[in-house]
Amino acid sequence: MRCVPVFIILLLLASPAAPKSLETRIQNDLIRAGLTDADLKTEKGFLSGLLNVAGSVCCKVDTSCCSN
C-alpha cells in the first residue's frame, strides 16, 4: 500500500520529461523558419542600402559610373 503514493509521485515527476508532441515541434520549426526568413529579408535590405550609398558616392566622385 505504501508503494502506490510513491508510484503516483514518480508518474507526476516523469510526465514533464516526456518527449515534445509533434504539434509543439512543428510550431517551433515554423517559428524558427520565420526568424530565418526575417534575417534574410533584413540582410537583403541592408545590402541594397549599401549599394545605394556606394552608387551615390560614386556619382559624386565620377559621373561615368552613374546610370543617369
UniProtKB/Swiss-Prot annotation:
Query: What is this protein's name?
Result: Conotoxin Lp5.2
Q: In the record, which residues are listed under signal peptide?
A: 1-19
Query: What is known about its processing and modification?
Result: Contains 2 disulfide bonds that can be either 'C1-C3, C2-C4' or 'C1-C4, C2-C3', since these disulfide connectivities have been observed for conotoxins with cysteine framework V (for examples, see AC P0DQQ7 and AC P81755).
Compartment(s) where it occurs, according to its Swiss-Prot or TrEMBL record? Secreted
Source organism per UniProt: Conus leopardus
Instruction: Quote the InterPro entries the UniProt record gives.
Output: T-conotoxin
Q: Provide the domain comment.
A: The cysteine framework is V (CC-CC).
GO MF terms held by the record: toxin activity
Instruction: Give the UniProt tissue specificity note.
Output: Expressed by the venom duct.
